């Protein structure tokens, strides 16, 4: 199993799909990496030579910020927004949508589950 940037790539998938398992590399970046490494995108991961894997690994480590470094950078950017107190930072702090979506209805993904509905419970009828 090929290991690139700390991620084990699935052996049975084509390399163009398997490389997207690395956080920070999508389809277009993956295709660019394979082009630079001179690797056929249709090749299965199990059929890659050690030399091809090392070329891909070197390009990813040299030119892309991936996995832990990218996650850390994203978290630091959000923390910076919250620290300076801008509108986007306040929305992050409140757990609300940041990009202008409506919140009167919807926005459940960002706001979480609804609370318990307060209502009248039906009484059981004794016979």
UniProtKB/Swiss-Prot annotation:
**InterPro entries noted in UniProt:** Rbsml_uS13_C, Ribosomal_uS13, Ribosomal_uS13-like_H2TH, Ribosomal_uS13_bac-type, Ribosomal_uS13_CS
Q: Is Repeat found in the keyword set?
A: no
**Segments forming a coiled coil:** none
PROSITE patterns annotated for this entry? RIBOSOMAL_S13_1 (PS00646), RIBOSOMAL_S13_2 (PS50159)
The record's Gene Ontology biological-process terms are: translation
- The source's superkingdom equals Bacteria
Decide whether keyword RNA-binding is in the record. yes
Q: Which Gene3D superfamilies match?
A: 1.10.8.50, 30s ribosomal protein s13, domain 2
Family (UniProt): Belongs to the universal ribosomal protein uS13 family.
Provide the protein name: Small ribosomal subunit protein uS13
Organism this protein belongs to: Roseiflexus sp. (strain RS-1)
Gene that encodes the chain: rpsM
